[in-house]
């Protein structure tokens, strides 16, 4: 899977990548692989972004930086972005991250995302999120690569509401997330935004054996 993703990026001459939250790319260690190939990849989920800056691994599937205190996060930001004044104010730190990431979304050559549900009936990719970074990763760059395990494929679009209801409640206790994205194609001729090209990488990595 890593080689497939790299070849897609290479053919598009993509050197900078923004990435939405994706546990499956953690599974295949995509960041390290692309970094060794000379491609800059930036996490855009705020928790993942903080963990990446600290050169650490996510400690939780939903809240990747839950192991870090407010002071530790403040120090990470101060060390990496001296242009901003040191602060332990959570709202100010969030604003700083937003400013940094907005510029990266605008300039990135490609965006990589995970997938929560992939609908076989329509070819639709469903992405669940609260921060809006997933939407930016999948619409702002000219190239979008979605990476997902084969267990995320569902047969019909009508299957999604029930699964979405279970997902949000079990993950964060919410009735529904702030953003629910449905992507069925790259940008069409009469559309003014969205990626010019789109690829879906399906990962097995032992899943078929577990199913058997």
Q: PLM ranges: what are they?
A:
Residues 2-211:
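The feature marks the mature, well-folded catalytic cores of soluble enzymes
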């Amino acid at each position: 899977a890593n080689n497939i993703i790299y070849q897609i990026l290479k053919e598009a001459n993509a050197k900078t990548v923004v990435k939405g939250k994706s546990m499956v790319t953690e599974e295949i260690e995509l960041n390290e692989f692309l970094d060794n190939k000379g491609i800059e990849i930036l996490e855009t989920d705020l928790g993942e972004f903080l963990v990446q800056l600290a050169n650490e691994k996510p400690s939780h599937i939903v809240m990747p930086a839950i192991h870090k205190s407010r002071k530790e996060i403040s120090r990470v930001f101060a060390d990496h972005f001296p242009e901003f004044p040191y602060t332990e104010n959570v709202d100010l730190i969030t604003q700083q991250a937003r400013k940094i990431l907005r510029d990266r979304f605008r300039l990135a050559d490609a965006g990589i995302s995970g997938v929560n549900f992939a609908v076989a009936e329509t070819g639709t990719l469903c992405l669940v999120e609260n921060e809006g970074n997933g939407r930016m990763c999948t619409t702002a760059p000219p190239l979008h690569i979605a990476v997902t395990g084969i267990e995320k494929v569902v047969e019909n679009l009508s299957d999604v509401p029930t699964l979405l209801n279970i997902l949000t409640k079990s993950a964060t206790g919410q009735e529904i997330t702030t953003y629910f994205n449905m992507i069925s194609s790259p940008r069409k001729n009469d559309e003014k935004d969205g990626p010019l090209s789109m690829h879906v990488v399906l990962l097995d990595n032992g899943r078929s054996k577990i199913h058997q």
